[in-house]
């Protein structure tokens, strides 16, 4: 099987490197490791933090991007979320969804913002004017007053789910054909039938595979502080001391292998990231029958 090289728009780190804490050299080294894994482009994703720390890491990531072409921009997942669906995020650092608050950390290198659309106070329209991708996530509602969003962050996770009695973020994501949907198809974050429903309901060109990988991914660590919480990895999944499921402990090549063995993988899911971010397709990966990458041409 041949596919395009992988673009990952949602990962918090890997190999022990945390984008909320890492220095320039650490990020550059991680970029090289990800490239060896077949991931040619990625959007370092920042979890909720203080404005000061967030601004610092935006600057660090921008400087690292000057040294490696794989860093395509920043995905700001934190700060503008709904505490009801905070997940592993530290809600103490959440801020109201206003233009004024966004300007406290605004930077042209921020390319994706995850937010709770039901709490919007003018931020969505401003972000779209700046050509920033707006994604609904860690939320319980949908856009208001005719506003539009571009995508949905880790569909089904940290959002109001499917119900036959009331509207929800998940239902809106499935029914809106124009909206892209991220999904963590690692076999842990989304149950197989829910995944099949997503893949059957959404247009095939609107599904984006993501890992939401934690810094502990592909490291020898069994515990690590992430998003101000101590995360424990049991060899299969990572959770906080309270039992909250954190991000994935797999990278996208691992997830593609899982999907392939379930006969659920479509090469278009890789192509969609190029389309979403207007990136010119280039290069290829060659996979064997067991969904291992055997050749990289890029």
Model-derived regions, located:
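Generic structural signal for well-ordered alpha-helices
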Residues: 31, 55-62, 102, 124, ...
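Divalent metal-binding pocket/active-site signature
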Residues: 76, 83-168
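Active-site-adjacent C-terminal substructures of enzyme catalytic domains
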Residues: 143-264
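C-terminal cap of metal-dependent C-N hydrolases
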Residues: 274-275, 280-298
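Divalent metal-dependent hydrolysis catalytic cores, especially in the metallo-beta-lactamase
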Residues: 11-15, 28-57, 70-82, 108-120, ...
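Residue-level marker for buried hydrophobic side chains located in beta-strands
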Residues: 5-7, 74, 134-136, 207-210
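Di-metal (Zn2+ and/or Mg2+/Mn2+) metal-binding site signature of metallo-dependent hydrolases
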Residues: 2-24
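Short, well-structured alpha-helical segments that form the helix of a local strand-helix-strand
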Residues: 264-273
């Amino acid at each position: 099987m041949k596919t395009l090289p992988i673009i990952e728009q949602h990962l918090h780190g890997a190999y022990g490197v945390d984008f909320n804490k890492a220095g320039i050299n650490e990020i550059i080294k991680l970029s090289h490791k990800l490239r060896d894994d077949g991931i040619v482009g990625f959007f370092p994703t920042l979890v909720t933090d203080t404005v000061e720390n967030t601004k610092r890491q935006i600057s660090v990531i921008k400087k690292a991007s000057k040294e490696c072409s794989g860093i395509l921009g920043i995905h700001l997942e934190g700060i503008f979320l709904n505490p009801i669906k905070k997940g592993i995020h530290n809600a103490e650092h959440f801020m109201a969804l206003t233009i004024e608050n966004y300007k406290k950390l605004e930077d042209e290198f921020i390319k994706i913002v995850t937010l709770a659309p039901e709490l919007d106070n003018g931020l969505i329209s401003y972000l779209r004017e700046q050509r920033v991708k707006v994604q609904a996530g860690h939320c319980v509602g949908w856009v208001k007053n005719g506003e539009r969003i571009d995508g949905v962050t880790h569909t089904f996770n940290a959002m109001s789910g499917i119900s036959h009695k009331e509207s929800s973020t998940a239902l809106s994501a499935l029914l809106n054909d124009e909206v892209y949907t991220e999904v963590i198809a690692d076999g842990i974050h989304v149950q197989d039938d829910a995944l099949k429903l997503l893949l059957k309901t959404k247009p095939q060109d609107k599904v984006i595979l993501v890992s939401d990988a934690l810094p502990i991914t592909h490291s020898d660590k069994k515990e690590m502080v992430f998003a101000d919480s101590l995360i424990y990895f049991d060899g299969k999944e990572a959770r906080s001391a309270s039992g909250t499921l954190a991000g994935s402990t797999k990278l996208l090549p691992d997830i593609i292998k899982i999907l392939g063995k379930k006969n659920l993988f479509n090469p278009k899911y890789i192509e969609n990231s190029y389309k979403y971010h207007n990136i010119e397709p280039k290069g290829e990966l060659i996979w064997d029958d067991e969904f291992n990458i055997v050749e990289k041409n890029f």
